[in-house]
Every structure is written in C-alpha cells, then in structure tokens.
Amino acid sequence: MGPNLQPPIPPPFLARMERLLGDEFGAFAASLALPPATGLRANTLKLSPQRLRELWPFDLAPLEWLPEGFVVPADETPGAAVPADGPITQARSRAVDAAPSRSQPGKHPYHAAGLYYLQDPSAMVVARLLDPQPGERVLDLCAAPGGKATHIAALMGNRGLFVANETHGRRVWDLAENLERWGARHAVITNESPDRLAERFEGFFDRVLVDSPCSGEGMFRKSPAARLEWTPDLIEGCARRQASILEAAARMLRPGGRVVYATCTFAPEEDERTLARFLSAHADFELVEPTRLPGFGTGRPDWIAGGAGSEQVGRAVRLWPHTGPGEGHFAAVLHYLGEPAGSATTRRPPRDRNREKAARGAADLFHRFCHDHLARDIRPERLEVAGTYLYAVPPGLPDLTGLRFIHPGWWLGTVRRDRFEPAHALAMGLELADFARSVSLPAGDDRALAFLRGASFPSQGEDGWVGVGVDGFPLGLGKRVGGSVKSHYPKGLRWS
C-alpha cells in the first residue's frame, strides 16, 4: 500500500453488505469511493444560522431537515482534513500545528470562537431525535469528542442540567475542550463507567443519549484505522458492550423519559438486533416512530431473526451515504412507560463548613473581579470550589462524591490566595458586551491571529483584563498593560 493510499475496504464487509442490500448495493458501494462530506453546525447559543451564513466567507448548503446544519461544498475545503465527528482541535497538551486558512473551516478564527462545530451531517440527526428541552435533566452517556454533546447543549439553551460523560481518560479532555469552546454553562463533565453512573443516578434523567461505541463501518470513507480494525468478531464484541450500556441507560431514566440509541455502523447485530433484544427484555419500553424527513430510511427487521421486539425495529432511522449527505448513521427513540426499578439514590453533598467558607471567600473574589473587569455581576444560584477552581454548578446537581469528574459545572476561574484569575471557559460562556473592556478584531486581522498564537498586540485603552473577540464574538481573554494586550489564550490551544 503506497503512502497516499488508504487500506482497502474489507472484502468480507462488502460481501456482507451486498447480501443485505441486494439491488441497493451498487449505489452503496459507489458512494464509498466518494470523498467524505463535511458538515458544519451553527452554535445557536452564540448566533443564528442565518447570521453564520452572512459571516461565512463561502457558500454553505443547508440541510433540509436541520435549520442549524449545513454541508460545506468539497471545493471550498481544499486540503482540509476534517474528522468525522468533531472540530480540528488537539488536546490541551498539544498545540494546534496548522496555519490559519479562511478556506478550511477547522482553521478559522470563527471556529476558535465556537461559532460552529464540524460534524458528519448524518450524525446531526441524533440530538434532534433526543429533542432535549430547556430546564430538563439530560445525560450524554458516551459523549466524546463532543459533536452530539455540543448540539444537546445548544438545544437546551444553557438551561437545566446536562451531564456529559466519557469513560475514556484521554478523550474526556477533548470533550471538555469542545464544550468549553461552545460556551456550555450548564454542563457537568464526568469520567465514569455507565454502571457506576447508574448506581448514583437511578431514575434521574428526562433524556439519555447512548451514542454507543461501535464497529465504525460508517467511518470507512474517512478513517483508514476503521478499515484496518474491522472484523466480524469486532461486531460481536461491540454488540455485547452496547447491550450493557443500554441497560445502564435505562436504569437512569425517569418514567415517561426518552433514550436515543445511536451508532455509526451498518451492522444489524449492533443496531436492530441490539434493540430487539432490549425490547424483548423490557416490556415497559417502546420504540417511537419519528417524523420521516428527507433521506430518513427505516430500520430493517428483515435483517435479524424474528422474536419479541423485532416487529418494532422498523421504527428506527437509518441514514445511508448513498441516499443523502453524510457517512451513515443508525438511531432509534425509546420511550419509557414504566416505573423506575428503585428510588433515585441522588443526594445533595453533605454539609462541609470548611468547604462552604472557602466557597464564600472565592465568591467574594469572583464578584470583585466582576465589578472591576466585567460590565455586569454574575451571580449563579450555586457556587462551589473544587481544589483551587471555582465553578457555577447547575441547579439540581446531586452529590458527585466518589465519582470521577472533570468539571462539575461552568469553570469560572482559579482562586490564588487573595486574587481571582478568570478561566478561558468564563470568557467563552459570555458575550463580548459583558466585558468592561473589549477588543473586537476582524477575522482576517493579523492581530486576531497573533492573539490565537499567544502573542501580544498593540491596543490603546484602560489597563486590565480585556475580552478579545472576532467580529463581536469572544475568542478569549487578554490583559492590557501600557498600550499592549498580552494574550491569555490557553497554551495548549494556541495556533502555531
């Protein structure tokens, strides 16, 4: 295999899909030879889809079934290497090694400002099927890198309690970074197994998303690793894991709640069969028939053996690369009809007077910072200290003692003795008008690029913390001293 060639699509996979698809197989196989689609979803926490189209330097093709979703024409992303479900970012420990380009959406200041997320167009259907509402309790159980989590946060309008969980110890930091850039203020980021969460949150959530780890057949167009890793045994192993995750999700749902089960694979063992087996064991769940929008195929009960539950799987949604934009997805909406298996075990943290005293002291420093550097005071309902970090904790969050978490809410900043240092997350959760001092730079301005590289730039005005933005949207924080703004853009995110 040459250096520029992808490994071949596994022949056993093609033979299997030919058997399943029949006359459709030719169109499906031809679609696998096409370039992957690049999707772009507007961040409605920060701007309207129409405003994004006005700002964007090139055309965007709207998705028929998602107002905030777009497809970026292939000829407008020359040389762009866009991942399947996430922006072109790196973990905080690695700098972004790419020159900025207006023609590559992952290397643009608007991306750094969190105005959009790069996502497979077919993956955008999942959060819409979950349909989270402002004020609800929502869980994304397998949330990294954050494509569906950022969508959920936007649909909730930063109101309610949103728990974004990822079991993988490294990927959870990508999730945290993407939610931070997105401006999610009501998100709690945990790093736990589904079973451990189920022990703590039984019967707690209104909606749960299971975007399950899978064999990744829908990644073949863009991921050489997915082609190399695929085997029939991988499918069976994933199916066993998916069944366990779905069981844990069901335990955490309140009566009348909704679970959306989704994968990016075509394998019926992981899709229809997993659902059918779950339904046969849970008569108190039913599969909901969603509105059939353009390009929405159905589940295929004919691909699995009959039995209890199999008659419902036709209500699932299948999106295919040969029938619409995107790489392909499977999603199903489960409605919980019954009573919870047990009473919810959630609880408020035990009273800790030393912790309360530390929180009061940190809150005083934070409000002093707001008075000196912001145009308004921010008074969350609940402020808590974790180590030296100060958080605005979403109302209704129960005790997390004993659970692994990254952020128990909106990270406001760090308390250092008698001063408060604002976090990047604080800036990304605000509007530029919320800062007492701000600098808004055009997207093509060299000063904006200098800021993203961590360099200072000239700026006259009052000394102090400054909100630095691009075309009116925050990019991060700087500190002005003597006519120069020093960039406080996080070192691990800086452009090179």
Kindly give the residue locations of the regions a language model identified.
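Polybasic, low-complexity RNA-engagement segments
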Residues: M1-L20, G26-R53, E327-F330, L337-S496
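Class I S-adenosyl-L-methionine
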Residues: A80-A81, F205, R240, R258-Y261, ...
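A short acidic, Gly/Pro-enriched loop at the edge of an enzyme's catalytic core
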Residues: Q133-P134, A198-L209
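Conserved class I S-adenosyl-L-methionine
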Residues: G135-C142
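Conserved SAM-binding loop of SAM-dependent methyltransferases across substrates and taxa
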Residues: P145-N158
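Helix-to-beta-strand junctions that scaffold the AdoMet/dcAdoMet cofactor pocket
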Residues: G157, L253-P255
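S-adenosyl-L-methionine
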Residues: T167-E202
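Mobile active-site "lid"/loop adjacent to the S-adenosyl-L-methionine
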Residues: R170, D206-E247, V260, C264-D271, ...
